[in-house]
């Protein structure tokens, strides 16, 4: 464990770095405006990962918990229909590229894991992805396991899968309605059996299944 004083110093440094980065972003946006480029500039601000500051007994990233995977994402472009709007929809970093190429009127490649966020940006409360995915490895007793995690609107489910065997050796399920900090694993609680099975099925179906459902929904909305 990190001593209390050292932990406070680390948190202080982390918050200071955020403030510094925020000021730099402000300088960039001010320069864009001063150059008269607001009307043809797309701004995207996001992080590649979250960060633990002593939470879950750890520091930095390197896990599948919400703090490490849930990141900020802000997008600004000219003539937005709903500027400053927020959404609680589930989105992924792989959605950024499809969004940018649509804004640039570039035809997308045949297969993309992500989906353009423009329909969601224009209508922030609309239905969107049922689930999003991430993964991170760890060694347990010299065995390499891949943590395959699925986030839905109210739950996070993680299956720890043997890299060599493909077998699931452990499961985690967190109920975000009652446990936003993911402190209690309810995977073995019989009351959550239906949700456990549903999320395991989503994991096996994977991102292609979610993309197909989203594409179908968007197509129906455009009719």
Predicted regions: what they are:
Residues 1-2, 17, 169, 178, ...:
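Long, internal low-complexity/basic segments
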Residues 3-17, 60, 81-91, 103-108, ...:
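Active-site rim elements
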Residues 14, 18-21, 25, 42-47, ...:
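Beta-strand elements within well-structured catalytic alpha/beta cores of enzymes
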Residues 30-85, 89-92:
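Histidine-centered active-site microenvironments of extracellular/periplasmic hydrolases
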Residues 34-37, 123-126, 188:
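Secondary-structure boundary motif
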Residues 97, 183, 203:
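Generic structural marker for isolated residues within well-ordered, non-membrane alpha-helices
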């Amino acid at each position: 464990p990190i001593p209390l004083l050292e932990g406070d110093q680390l948190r202080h440094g982390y918050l200071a770095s955020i403030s510094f980065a925020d000021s730099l972003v402000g300088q960039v946006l001010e320069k864009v405006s001063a150059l008269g480029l607001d009307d043809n500039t797309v701004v995207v601000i996001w992080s590649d990962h979250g960060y633990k500051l002593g939470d879950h007994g750890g520091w930095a990233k390197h896990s599948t918990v919400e703090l490490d995977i849930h990141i900020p994402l802000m997008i600004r472009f000219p003539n937005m229909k709903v500027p400053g709007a927020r959404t609680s929809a589930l989105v992924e970093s792989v959605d950024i590229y499809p969004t940018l190429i649509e804004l640039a009127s570039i035809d997308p490649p045949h297969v993309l894991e992500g989906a353009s966020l423009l329909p969601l940006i224009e209508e922030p409360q609309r239905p969107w992805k049922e689930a999003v995915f991430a993964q991170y490895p760890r060694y347990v007793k010299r065995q390499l396991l891949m943590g395959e995690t699925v986030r839905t609107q109210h739950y996070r489910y993680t299956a720890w899968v043997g890299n060599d065997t493909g077998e699931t050796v452990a499961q985690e399920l967190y109920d975000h309605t009652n446990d936003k900090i993911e402190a209690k694993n309810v995977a073995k609680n019989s009351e959550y059996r239906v949700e456990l099975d549903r999320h395991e099925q989503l994991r096996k179906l994977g991102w292609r299944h979610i993309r197909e459902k989203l594409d179908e929904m968007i197509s129906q909305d455009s009719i």
